[in-house]
Amino acid sequence: MTGSWKAEHIPQLAGRRFLITGANSGIGYAAALKLARKDAELILACRDLEKGEAALAHLREEAPSVRAELVALDLSSLVSIRAFAAQEIARRRPLHVLINNAGVMAIPTRTLTSDGFEMQFGTNVLGHFALTGLLWPALEQAAQESSDPPRVVTIASIAHKRTHLELEDLQSARSYSPLRAYQQSKLANLMLALEMSRRLRRKNSPILSIAAHPGVASTALFRAHNDSNLARALRKLAGQAISIFLNDEAEGALPTLYAATSPEAENGGYYGPQQLNEMKGEIVGPAKIADHARNESLAAALWSRCEDLTGVRYLDEDRDTLTEKIA
């Protein structure tokens, strides 16, 4: 049904809890709005609480019956991630869908997180890896209590095709290119989502790991990069006509919504828009995965490296339950 799937096909979601990182703007907010209109219970996880409050107020205007809460979560800080996850797990409530959406893009100069990681890899990859692992008990609880499989939805990018993973330089310490660091983070996101799906399959787990990408969406993240060489070149070539190559935020959210709600979305699936070489469109379908993103041994090594860097271990091939290292 992917070729004909639309947001109207989202089923009623009453009783299901969705956590969306970076839900205050862009694709995250657009997805939250569609889910709210289908009666989902939402957790909006945002770094900037002021912007989060504004987004929540706007959401309540557009979907007055929404059940939503705002939580503070800084994915560039393991302290923040651990604090939030501990509070959430203590509530003993199931989490049916985790949408790992937040991200930073093409930071001009190499910047470090509070934990000493390169900002894009630390936020986009390690932050979400740790968050997912620390929330795993809530996903397992949902699996036990619901017949509808819980899902981890990872937002990747067509940018993953433009680079290869440098396992020995994940932090871009040897040389820093703003765009390449972003591309590597998105490649890592996709490889980890695929690796998660394989581990879940081997454990016969009902939980699904699904990836999606928005095409090229006109979001705050994209606009924040508008002083890059790429953006300047595009403006010079196309001026205002560039909009024909960009999804708006609502269109950009469709692959995420498909991955998060469609009964046809599969474990290990990767979905995106189907027009203009996957750059835009209202039609959602299977997205192309670069051959180098399918390297299973490299993905397994990346998973282990993320465990070592974050101190969070889950879906371990030698363990049946989540184990967190003492940092």
Language-model features and meaning:
Residues 185, 236-286, 294-300:
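C-terminal helical subdomain
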Residues 209, 216, 220, 287, ...:
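Mid/C-terminal beta-alpha module of Rossmann-like enzyme folds, strongest
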Residues 216, 273-276, 322-324:
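Short, solvent-exposed turn/loop segments enriched in Gly/Ser/Thr/Pro and often Arg
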Residues 295, 299-327:
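Amphipathic terminal alpha-helices
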